[in-house]
Structure formats: C-alpha cells, structure tokens
Amino acid sequence: MKSQIKLFIELTRLNKPIGIMLLFWPCSWGLAYAYNYTKNLSQFLFYFLLFFFGSVLMRSAGCIINDIVDKDYDKKVKRTKQRPIAANLVSVTQALIYSALLCLVAFFILIQFNKLTIILGLSSMLLAFSYPFMKRITYWPQLFLGVTFN
C-alpha cells in the first residue's frame, strides 16, 4: 500500500516537474522583461515566487482534473493504468477535494496581482480545465494545451 503522500505526489505529477516548468518559464520570462530593475529587487523576487508557486499549484490541480476526466480511458492504457485514480488508489471525491484545495491556495496567490491579471488568470483556468475534453474531439489536444499555457 502506497502512502498518501506518495499517492498525492503521483496524482499531482510533482515527480515529473517538466509540466511545471513549461507553465512557469513563460511567466518568469514575462516578469523579467517587464520588471523595472531600478526598483527594489525584493518586489521582483516576490512576484517570481508567486509565479512559481502558482505554476506548481495550477499544474498539479490540472493533472488531477485530467485524471478524473480520463479515469476510464486511463484504466485501458498501459502507460496510464497505474495512475492513482485509474488504479482506484485515490477516489474521485478525494481527488476533487485535493484539486479544490490546490485551486483555493492558487486563488489566494492570484489575488496578489492586479485586476487584469486576476481576470486573465481566472479565464485561463477555463481553457486549462477543458484540455481533457479536447482529447475527445481532436488528435492534437497538446496544441490546445500549449496555446492555453502561453
């Protein structure tokens, strides 16, 4: 029996951080280009950390939502059948609670930004969480996800 922590790490794909970096690096580059370096660097570091933790939280929540939506498909695919929800190691209810908590913490990070950023951040969630459904209507769902991330 796997520990709950290990299951959570697998569920959120924290053991596979490339997705976090794909979300985080465009944010950090945008911040680096936009920041006025004549000001205090502590503000830059503050926003840098907000972007990093926001990326970790939202990518993790997105992975959980993806696994919930795809659980029946994941059970049939060799590469994905051992994912915690597909393997019935984590219930859909538990996964929804985990995802909601991650989104709640991410929301508290998001409200540290200005109004436009909050609106854009909330609207991008709709795009990100629609990704699992794109797999049912196109052979290129990753293109949709890439556009969503950037």
Predicted segment positions?
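Cytosolic, membrane-interface loops and tails of multi-pass inner-membrane proteins
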Residues: 1-6, 63-90
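Perimembrane helix-loop junctions in membrane proteins
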Residues: 34, 38, 71-74, 135-139
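Juxtamembrane/transmembrane-helix boundary motifs in multi-pass membrane proteins
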Residues: 2, 6, 14, 38-46, ...
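Membrane-interface helix starts
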Residues: 13-23
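Hydrophobic positions within alpha-helical membrane elements
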Residues: 20, 64, 72-75, 79, ...
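Intramembrane alpha-helical segments
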Residues: 9-10, 83-150
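Small-residue-rich segments of transmembrane alpha-helices in multi-pass membrane proteins
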Residues: 21-33, 84, 144-150
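Membrane-embedded alpha-helical segments that form the functional core of polytopic membrane enzymes
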Residues: 27-28, 32-69, 79, 103-107, ...
